[in-house]
């Protein structure tokens, strides 16, 4: 195999990182909705923590995307 094909295989494998970020964000907000349904008075605190967690999970997906773009264009 030549280097170009290996770059595209590596880029395809980077999609796993983006898939993991999507699963993480969906789990965070699923848990948020069920927690708010159980205890509506804690909504503000739960939302703040969920948004921080979603931001961190989404950052991992963005890092994966940046690395994939570096692999393609380098």
From Swiss-Prot:
GO cellular component entries: plasma membrane; proton-transporting ATP synthase complex; proton-transporting two-sector ATPase complex, proton-transporting domain
Cell wall biogenesis/degradation in keyword set: no
Source species, domain of life: Bacteria
Presence of the UniProt keyword Cell inner membrane in the record: yes
Compartments in which it is found: Cell inner membrane
Entry's Gene Ontology molecular function annotations: lipid binding; proton-transporting ATP synthase activity, rotational mechanism
Topology in membrane: Multi-pass membrane protein
Gene3D superfamilies: F1F0 ATP synthase subunit C
Site entry: Reversibly protonated during proton transport: 58
Alphabetized Pfam families for the sequence: ATP-synt_C
Record-linked InterPro entries: ATP_synth_F0_csu, ATP_synth_F0_csu_DDCD_BS, ATP_synth_F0_csu_sf, ATPase_proteolipid_c-like_dom, F/V-ATP_Csub_sf
TM annotation in the entry: 8-28, 52-72
Keyword list, A-Z: ATP synthesis, Cell inner membrane, Cell membrane, CF(0), Hydrogen ion transport, Ion transport, Lipid-binding, Membrane, Transmembrane, Transmembrane helix, Transport
Function: F(1)F(0) ATP synthase produces ATP from ADP in the presence of a proton or sodium gradient. F-type ATPases consist of two structural domains, F(1) containing the extramembraneous catalytic core and F(0) containing the membrane proton channel, linked together by a central stalk and a peripheral stalk. During catalysis, ATP synthesis in the catalytic domain of F(1) is coupled via a rotary mechanism of the central stalk subunits to proton translocation.
Subunit: F-type ATPases have 2 components, F(1) - the catalytic core - and F(0) - the membrane proton channel. F(1) has five subunits: alpha(3), beta(3), gamma(1), delta(1), epsilon(1). F(0) has three main subunits: a(1), b(2) and c(10-14). The alpha and beta chains form an alternating ring which encloses part of the gamma chain. F(1) is attached to F(0) by a central stalk formed by the gamma and epsilon chains, while a peripheral stalk is formed by the delta and b chains.
Family indicated by similarity: Belongs to the ATPase C chain family.
Full protein name: ATP synthase subunit c
Species name: Rickettsia peacockii (strain Rustic)
């Amino acid at each position: 195999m030549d280097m170009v094909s290996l770059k595209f295989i590596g880029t395809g494998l980077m999609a796993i990182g983006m898939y993991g970020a999507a699963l993480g964000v969906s789990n965070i907000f699923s848990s948020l909705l069920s927690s708010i349904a159980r205890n509506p008075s804690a909504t503000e605190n739960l939302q703040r923590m969920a948004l921080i967690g979603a931001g961190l999970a989404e950052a991992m997906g963005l890092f994966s995307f940046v690395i994939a773009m570096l692999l393609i264009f380098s």
